């Protein structure tokens, strides 16, 4: 397999046909067709189905596509790093940050990082799994800060940072804000963030392991911390979130954690990166700045900083 063949496959997937792929790549249609035909002949498999409206990937093409994307991304990264050595382009670091950490620790971490490596171009995403995992796999994101318990170990490496408690959250006006058991909350509507595994693991963790069953239509999935928080505060839904979210706007001062008899799960925030992608100097510096910020919270004079430190058990 050659790079130009994989680029042709990716362009067809993006554009939906040979003509669009040629336009994306700046090549002739004949050149794109030739590259794809050579790739199919080498693999002994049909990778495309041509039709009147363009072309679509076969099952074999769909299997090859993510590998092609990763190979192209890694080559681009190698080209960037070599260009950095030549002084032609600035270094770049892309990080996904879980929402509660973004609101409580990101500012101090970024200040320290900018002082240490001011020439690095930093890009930050709100790092819910639905956003971070595809970017990590493509090589466009270098590391993510978030829960790693359900991630495949053969694909990702994770460095634990801190353990925290999960909590059931309700607004101060919620009619069941004084509930003492999950059994009292089965007829209420909930909002949760699901990882790549869907809602089933969360439902088991929160309800089923305690002997309760809840209708899944009562659970709204929110892939945005802003939407999740708004639905708890403004729509009167119950939430299941990391305890540090209580320190984050708009939940701070408007919600409370329910004091339930059932023990809720602990979770862990980790540094996550691809197993086959080593961390460079910028990534390692960012991690060190974050670890320093975490440790500093326990020594801070700020009551809010000490409150966060009390919610966390450091794991490094």
Question: What do these predicted regions represent?
Answer:
Residues 10-31:
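Short helix-boundary/capping micro-motifs
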Residues 40-62:
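A short LG(V/I)-centered, amphipathic sequence patch enriched
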Residues 42-43, 64-86, 286:
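Alpha-helical linker/hinge and terminal dimerization helices associated
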Residues 90-152:
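Central regulatory/effector-binding core of bacterial HTH transcription factors
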Residues 147, 176, 188-211, 243, ...:
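Secondary-structure junction motif
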Residues 156-191, 195:
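Flexible hinge/capping segments at coil-to-helix
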């Amino acid at each position: 397999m050659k790079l130009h063949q994989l680029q042709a496959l990716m362009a067809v997937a993006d554009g939906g046909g040979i003509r669009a792929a040629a336009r994306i790549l700046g090549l002739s249609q004949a050149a794109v067709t030739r590259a794809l035909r050579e790739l199919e002949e080498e693999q002994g498999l049909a990778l495309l189905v041509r039709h009147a409206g363009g072309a679509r990937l076969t099952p074999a093409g769909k299997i090859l596509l993510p590998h092609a994307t990763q190979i192209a991304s890694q080559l681009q990264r190698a080209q960037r790093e070599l260009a950095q050595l030549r002084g032609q382009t600035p270094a770049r670091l892309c990080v996904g940050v879980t929402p509660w950490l973004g609101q409580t620790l990101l500012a101090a971490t970024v200040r320290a990082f900018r002082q240490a490596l001011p020439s690095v171009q930093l890009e930050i995403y709100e790092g819910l799994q639905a956003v971070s995992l595809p970017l990590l796999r493509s090589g466009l994101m270098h590391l993510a800060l978030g829960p790693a318990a359900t991630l495949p170990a053969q694909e990702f490496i994770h460095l634990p940072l801190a353990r925290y408690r999960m909590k059931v959250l309700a607004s101060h006006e919620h009619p069941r804000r004084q509930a003492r058991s999950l059994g009292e909350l089965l007829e209420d509507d909930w909002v949760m963030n699901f990882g790549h595994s869907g809602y089933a693991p969360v439902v088991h963790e929160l309800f089923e392991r305690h002997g309760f069953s809840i209708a899944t239509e009562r659970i709204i999935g929110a892939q945005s911390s802003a939407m999740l928080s708004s639905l708890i505060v403004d729509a009167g839904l119950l939430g299941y979130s990391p305890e540090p979210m209580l320190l984050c706007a708009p939940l701070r001062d408007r919600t409370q954690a329910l004091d339930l008899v059932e023990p809720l799960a602990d979770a862990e925030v980790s540094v996550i990166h691809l197993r086959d992608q080593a961390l460079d100097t910028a990534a390692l510096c960012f991690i060190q700045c974050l670890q320093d910020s975490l440790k500093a919270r326990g020594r801070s004079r700020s009551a809010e900083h000490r409150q966060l430190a009390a919610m966390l058990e450091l794991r490094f």
